[in-house]
């Protein structure tokens, strides 16, 4: 086997690949043949588990009740010296048009945990009659600032680390859905109790621009920092938990690639997570087909991080929205900028179009 261009050559593997041993074997053959030494295996998507869990409902697309996809991947990958990171979708809960099949899904058990866009006290209740208001295209998200959400998600991560010899935990959707989310009434009431302040003015569609502008900048900053810190605290606690149970476990997160947009729009301060040591790796999803925008996101990283932090940044590159030559240019540029690794999204695209992958394969070997 020829050598790797990067120390860490990672491949995202979407959950529909790990529903049977045959599909997993085919994926692992591909990874081995193509010099990938880290696999990000999606084991929690749409609030469902692709592993044996005591409390997360099992995915309905795994037809063999005796089959444990994560256990099988770990056994086979470790035999070939490939590291496995359990890729966990965090706050996003459901993204299908049809509702979940399992009655044990959080969608049914705790609709009161789901975040809302804007604020309207009347539409919040203990059932899910009005959840369509929170979908808004991408899917339903848990409210990061709801006091019950972080303990639940931490237990999801803890169960994986305790039961499986994973080499890493990979956090995805570790952010707010968007800037105008945060209107979960229960979480807002908790914020009001803790801070003595009312944030509903910033979220209500009935509030005029003039009314919002009258609110002090310090109140707005306080509210935004509170939401931001809700996410950061979960990342911090995840790191503490992983270090206690499995000290060698690599904690990483897939993040918005523009540092400022991540922080200000999605309340995802991954610069803090990296600098504070809450994460071992950060993987910006630098999926833009535009080389100029791709490079601009890297420029922001260079402006904000000295080399000792850039050594822990793995550059995420997409294959679904650009030509293979464009993807190769971004791989080469990531090497030029001295990042220690790349993560390719995703195996599913490459598996469906082998010819597309040939130039990318050549760019990843030396």
Where are the regions a protein language model picked out?
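Substrate-binding cleft/loops of secretory-pathway carbohydrate-active enzymes
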Residues: 93-96, 170, 179, 244-283, ...
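Active-site-adjacent "subsite" loops/lids of carbohydrate-active enzymes
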Residues: 4-10, 18, 86, 91-163
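Aromatic-lined substrate-binding rim segments of carbohydrate-active enzymes
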Residues: 28, 45-89, 226-245
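Substrate-binding cleft of secreted/luminal carbohydrate-active enzymes
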Residues: 278-295, 301-304, 308-366
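Aromatic- and acidic-residue-enriched segments that line the glycan-binding/catalytic groove
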Residues: 53-62, 92-133, 173-213
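Aromatic-lined carbohydrate-recognition surfaces of secreted/lumenal glycan-active proteins
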Residues: 83-91, 170-178, 203-206, 216-266, ...
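Catalytic domains of carbohydrate-active enzymes, especially glycoside hydrolases
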Residues: 23-49, 163-168, 278-281, 337, ...
């Amino acid at each position: 086997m020829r050598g790797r261009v990067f120390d860490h050559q990672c491949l995202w593997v979407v959950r529909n690949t790990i529903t049977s041993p045959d599909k997993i074997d085919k994926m692992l053959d591909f990874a081995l043949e193509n010099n990938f030494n880290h696999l990000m295996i999606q084991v929690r998507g749409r609030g469902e588990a692709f592993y044996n869990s005591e409390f997360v409902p099992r995915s309905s697309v795994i037809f063999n009740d005796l089959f444990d996809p994560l256990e099988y991947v770990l056994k086979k990958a470790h035999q070939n010296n490939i590291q496995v990171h359990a890729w966990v979708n965090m706050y996003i809960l459901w993204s299908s048009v049809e509702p979940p099949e399992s009655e044990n899904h959080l969608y049914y058990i705790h609709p009161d945990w789901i975040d809302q866009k804007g604020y309207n006290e009347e539409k919040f209740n203990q059932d899910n009659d009005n959840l369509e208001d929170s979908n808004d295209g991408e899917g339903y998200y848990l409210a990061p600032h709801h006091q019950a959400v972080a303990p639940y998600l931490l237990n999801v991560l803890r169960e994986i680390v305790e039961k499986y010899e994973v080499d890493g935990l990979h956090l995805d959707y570790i952010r707010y859905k968007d800037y105008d989310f945060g209107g979960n009434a229960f979480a807002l009431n908790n914020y009001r109790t803790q801070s003595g302040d009312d944030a509903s003015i910033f979220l209500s569609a009935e509030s005029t621009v003039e009314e919002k502008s009258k609110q002090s900048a310090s109140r707005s900053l306080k509210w935004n920092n509170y939401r931001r810190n809700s996410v950061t605290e979960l990342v911090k606690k995840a790191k503490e938990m992983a270090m206690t149970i499995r000290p060698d476990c690599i904690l990483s997160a897939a993040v918005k690639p523009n540092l400022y947009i991540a922080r200000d729009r999605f309340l995802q301060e991954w610069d803090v997570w990296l600098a504070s040591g809450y994460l071992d790796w950060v993987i910006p999803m630098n999926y833009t087909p535009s080389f100029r925008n791709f490079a601009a996101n890297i420029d922001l990283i260079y402006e904000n991080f000295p080399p000792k932090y850039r050594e822990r940044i793995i550059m995420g590159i997409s294959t679904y929205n650009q030509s293979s030559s464009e993807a190769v240019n971004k791989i080469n540029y990531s090497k030029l900028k001295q990042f220690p690794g790349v993560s390719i999204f995703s195996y599913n695209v490459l598996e469906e179009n082998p010819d597309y992958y040939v130039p990318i394969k050549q760019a990843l070997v030396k």
